[in-house]
């Protein structure tokens, strides 16, 4: 609300909103497209994104000069390939890959895999992982596209690789790519976790001209390089 108010005061008409695939909750069909119901969030985080999107849609209806793009991220991972910029969670990571890298680096005793009885190939949750560099490029493409469109405008786009990988598959691939061992234990399900979700990214590809240029292997490799850079930096202090 504050951002929308300041935009109005300052005459800013273009908005790119960082939304999330969590607005879909547990989809009934996969891959999930932007046409799927977007009000079924199963977590508090997802619900905040649903509310945020609704506020923006209401603002566009009320202000016909406003243009907005809602980018629904799936699971961004990785870091800059040079290891200078990356994810630095405060406290215990809530996402899988930072927990993997911190465990491999010896900062955490073990990785807990939450749930092994989901209706997936190996019983663990399936997600759509994409490199953070691809997320960054999508923002640039969204801004350029939005500038060319008439107002009012409010369009949602999925940002995902278009394929799902299970938690076990990601851990195994990380170990293969980096040569690092990740101690792991089995734990109970986490409240709010959906079994599986991955994107139909057709709209992003056809409308924005966006594609995932980085695969899961490179994203995991860059995430590990970032973790190693953090370790080296802390050793010099």
Give the residues covered by each predicted segment:
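Catalytic helix-loop patch of NAD(P)-dependent Rossmann-fold dehydrogenases
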Residues: 1-2, 9, 13-14, 23-75, ...
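Conserved active-site region of classical short-chain dehydrogenase/reductase
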Residues: 1-5, 54, 133-136, 140
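Active-site loop of short-chain dehydrogenase/reductase
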Residues: 11-15, 65-67, 109-110, 151-155
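Residue(s) in the substrate-gating loop at a strand-loop-helix junction
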Residues: 20
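Feature marks short, surface-exposed loop/turn motifs that line or immediately flank catalytic pockets
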Residues: 24, 77, 163-165
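Short aromatic-enriched loop/helix-cap "lid" or pocket-rim segments at secondary-structure transitions
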Residues: 28-30, 80-85, 125-126, 170
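Oxidoreductase cofactor-interface core, primarily capturing Rossmann-like NAD(P)-dependent enzymes
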Residues: 71, 82, 110-113
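C-terminal substrate-binding subdomain of Rossmann-fold SDR/epimerase-dehydratase oxidoreductases
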Residues: 96-237
């Amino acid at each position: 609300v504050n951002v929308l108010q300041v935009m109005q005061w300052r005459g800013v008409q273009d908005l790119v909103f960082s939304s999330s695939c969590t607005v879909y909750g547990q989809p009934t069909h996969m891959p999930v497209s932007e046409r799927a119901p977007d009000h079924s969030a199963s977590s508090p985080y997802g619900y905040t994104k649903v509310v945020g999107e609704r506020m923006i849609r209401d603002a566009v209806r009320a202000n016909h000069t406003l243009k907005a793009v809602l980018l629904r991220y799936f699971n961004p991972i990785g870091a800059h390939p040079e290891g200078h910029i990356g994810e630095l969670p405060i406290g215990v990571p809530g996402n899988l890959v930072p927990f993997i890298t911190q465990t491999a680096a010896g900062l955490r005793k073990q990785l807990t895999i939450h749930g092994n009885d989901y209706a997936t190939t190996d019983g663990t949750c399936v997600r759509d992982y994409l490199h953070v560099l691809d997320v960054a490029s999508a923002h640039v493409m969204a801004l350029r596209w939005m500038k060319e469109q008439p107002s009012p405008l409010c369009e949602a786009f999925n940002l995902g690789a278009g394929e799902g990988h299970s938690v076990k598959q990601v851990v195994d691939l990380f170990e293969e790519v980096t040569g690092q061992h990740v101690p792991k234990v089995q734990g109970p399900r986490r409240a709010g976790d959906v079994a599986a979700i991955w994107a139909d990214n057709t709209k992003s590809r056809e409308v924005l001209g966006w594609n995932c240029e980085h695969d899961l292997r490179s994203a995991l490799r860059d995430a590990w390089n970032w973790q190693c850079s953090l370790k080296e930096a802390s050793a010099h202090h």
